[in-house]
UniProtKB/Swiss-Prot annotation:
It is an enzyme of class 1 (oxidoreductase). PANTHER family: ALANINE DEHYDROGENASE. The active site is at 94. GO terms for molecular function: alanine dehydrogenase activity. Its EC number is 1.4.1.1. It comes from Staphylococcus aureus (strain Mu50 / ATCC 700699). InterPro entries: Ala_DH (IPR008141), Ala_DH/PNT_CS2 (IPR008143), AlaDH/PNT_CS1 (IPR008142), AlaDH/PNT_N (IPR007886), AlaDH/PNT_NAD(H)-bd (IPR007698), NAD(P)-bd_dom_sf (IPR036291). This is Alanine dehydrogenase 1. It comes from the Bacteria. It catalyses: L-alanine + NAD(+) + H2O = pyruvate + NH4(+) + NADH + H(+). GO terms for biological process: L-alanine catabolic process.
Amino acid sequence: MLVAVVKELKQGEGRVACTPENVRKLTDAGHKVIVEKNAGIGSGFSNDMYEKEGAKIVTHEQAWEADLVIKVKEPHESEYQYFKKNQIIWGFLHLASSKEIVEKMQEVGVTAISGETIIKNGKAELLAPMSAIAGQRSAIMGAYYSEAQHGGQGTLVTGVHENVDIPGSTYVIFGGGVAATNAANVALGLNAKVIIIELNDDRIKYLEDMYAEKDVTVVKSTPENLAEQIKKADVFISTILIPGAKPPKLVTREMVKSMKKGSVLIDIAIDQGGTIETIRPTTISDPVYEEEGVIHYGVPNQPGAVPRTSTMALAQGNIDYILEICDKGLEQAIKDNEALSTGVNIYQGQVTNQGLASSHDLDYKEILNVIE
């Protein structure tokens, strides 16, 4: 199987989907690997480093001729022209956010494997490290954009406690998963007060136990509680993600209007559509805008801003799956590995993820019923 590592076109995206170390694992297993020129530069990996591990350096167009194209994020619209029948595209594709790309993949007969929908032992194991990074970084961005020169309230989120008692900021975090706890931990480290809004009762108990000795309040998620708590936020971070599907707009414009002027609003799951009515995708180089008097931060690829850390994390997670696909062939790998099967969103043009099908009102096929 010919495997290609392509350079990301998404603005500000410095990650690469495969490290030189993982290229060596593939070539040692007898697979041919091509790497687009400068694909790894943003993460600190030179072309020479890939060549030393057995890869051939190629152009962007040549990379897309591969049987298996390994990416970090969804293909750019300029790359749709390279799709070919039975080609496998691997990455954090977040296909629920774009019907256009899904229809193009269906038209050509592409197979799309989305790392964010791979579930193993009840957990999104490939997404979790990226969620952790996005959560931590969101807390930091909330502090940064709270400053006056960025349009924020002009507050220092840590407060001041040297001979005076100026309280820190309040972070309201919507959702209680991996991204949420990582955001909360950074916020607590900044001496901020944290409120977590969570739906699941078992998770609420877990969070209450986890933060029993910390300045954290855990609140049951209801529309009424959300509307009440968001008014307290100096920084509001939404972490709600439904794997494979587009989430509902749970944070309404009226709720945003009720927030403090100059407060900061961040949606970590904006790459899947987000849960905030007033949010739209932004970029790492132009990350914020003001609406309803609130600073909106809608960067969909936050881990791409710290590519050295993020690339190492994602590469550790994806290589075993990629090797299994290459060694066994996709169909046998799917049959043998239930977790891998949950990542197949489109198989040869057929939608095989129920959440994705529902998001775009498309026909759904069970993956094990369509593989040969």
